[in-house]
């Protein structure tokens, strides 16, 4: 049995490239030494999540979350320390027979996961080992659901009795857990199972925990109106957030950075049988922003494979608007069929071929979707051009614009190529004017303006590392994506960087130097008069100094484990700074000079306040004393 001491944990972490680990969950792009992606811990549209593979940590400049590989697994999978270590060991291919000396904190949702897991097991047993289950399996087999599919998706059967689950689980869980589980209805002091006489599809979260169910009616004599009934909203189940099959699809999505989006369970099952694994379903509900935010953490491309009927096409139209045209492709399922029906008519190979080669771009779908029925009317044609021309104008390729202009001309009986082209060009010009209202701007002038706005001041003296560029490189370039206008060639930041004062930037850079240069830390540890301006930096300095004194070195992982959440976030932010390896004495002097000046300014303002208090109190002796101090302090500024 292995005890999880520091040495064992650190040895395990050393075997793992943290960027490889996190890329299983988040789509990462390389930028210099680091990797960036959309933060999985808060909703964002612009990447601010940094991963440093060399030093083995991550840090989000948006929400401040940070840590090492184990901390990431704890946060992302909502598990305790031991489970995170086990997951990391599995990823590294290391076998650990763990005996944990630490007290695991209970996940507050663990009982809800467990009661739903046990219900899923009971439903599956009923399907696989009862006479009623045999009839239900025959029904499923006729619809292409084999025993292999039943096993993979843990499909089950709710019996006709309305108290089967209650009788089997009521003695194992308390009333509060049962009430919160979503498995029961309560009426007039009676308890009934929420699902009866239905094929049961367990709904799991992305970590594989059962969080709810969707029950499908299967018998002809079933008078219930709803084809599917879902678990009502609970603490652990939110239909606007969860996606069916995400736990099984996640590894392939993360690897390929592409996800197929479908409407229902049977569609996903058909795709699985066709050998396509990166497929999820929104369970019949409309796609939401929550769904998209989750998937964008793993995928860069979305392929919409919705039903071919009008409802499915309407859903595609709304999804394009939610996701953004540049990241979407559409598979139009012919003949108004859904993917499951298509696989039955044309075989699994036919479905696989359709999913891969039948993709079209959003603009092609929108031209067909928005095409009016009555194109004999001139005003209708004009309105159609007004709708489509901005979409064509946004296309980055002139060749693509030309192709879709020609497609419009084929549709419109009263318009020729040059007329439609003129409408598109006008839209393009209007877009350029809107994007760049100030004329005669070049890239350098905008960069200077942006720099001034965010107070990225350079050091007055010549330094080996430029203060402005060092901080800009880390806190701007690696956090932001930039939109480059083809017409003006102007780089525009897509988000605002959290502002730090010039002093705060200098303090962070000095702390970085102390962490990685023992001579710098030693120099300031021997200066009794040295202090940082801001308390959070002074507190961190004290703990860095203590780490060095006790252990005669600074171990980043160990130090991080000794810090509070707020201190740890600040620590990771500081060691994320991408500074040159060498540090000159002149650089250190200049950094200290920057925040020393602010310290002197603070002292000056405090003396002014004290003077006002003394004057108000009529203390002439104190007024004279403070006046002299203010004069002397003014000379230091």
From Swiss-Prot:
Toprim domain: which residues? Answer: 257-338
User: What cofactor does this protein call for?
Assistant: Zn(2+); Mg(2+)
Residue ranges annotated as zinc fingers (CHC2-type) are: 39-63
Q: What class of enzyme is it?
A: transferase
Where along this sequence does the record place binding of Mg(2+) 1?
263, 307
* Catalysed reactions, semicolon-separated: ssDNA + n NTP = ssDNA/pppN(pN)n-1 hybrid + (n-1) diphosphate
Q: Which BP terms from GO are recorded?
A: DNA replication, synthesis of primer
Xref: SUPFAM superfamilies = DNA primase core, Zinc beta-ribbon
Q: Which Pfam families match?
A: DnaB_bind, DNAG_N, Toprim_2, Zn_ribbon_DnaG
Q: What is the free-text note on the cofactor?
A: Binds 1 zinc ion per monomer.
Q: Which UniProt keywords apply?
A: DNA replication, DNA-binding, DNA-directed RNA polymerase, Magnesium, Metal-binding, Nucleotidyltransferase, Primosome, Transcription, Transferase, Zinc, Zinc-finger
* EC number of the protein: 2.7.7.101
* Zinc-finger is among the record's keywords: yes
Which InterPro entries did the record assign?
Answer: DNA_helicase_N/primase_C (IPR016136), DNA_primase_core_N_sf (IPR037068), DNA_primase_DnaB-bd (IPR019475), DNA_primase_DnaG (IPR006295), DNA_primase_Znf_CHC2 (IPR036977), DnaG_bac (IPR030846), DNAG_N (IPR013264), DnaG_primase (IPR050219)
Domain characteristics, as noted in the entry: Contains an N-terminal zinc-binding domain, a central core domain that contains the primase activity, and a C-terminal DnaB-binding domain.
Q: How does it assemble?
A: Monomer. Interacts with DnaB.
The task this protein performs is described as:
RNA polymerase that catalyzes the synthesis of short RNA molecules used as primers for DNA polymerase during DNA replication.
Query: Which PANTHER family has this protein been placed in?
Result: DNA PRIMASE
Entry protein name: DNA primase
Encoding gene, per UniProt annotation? dnaG
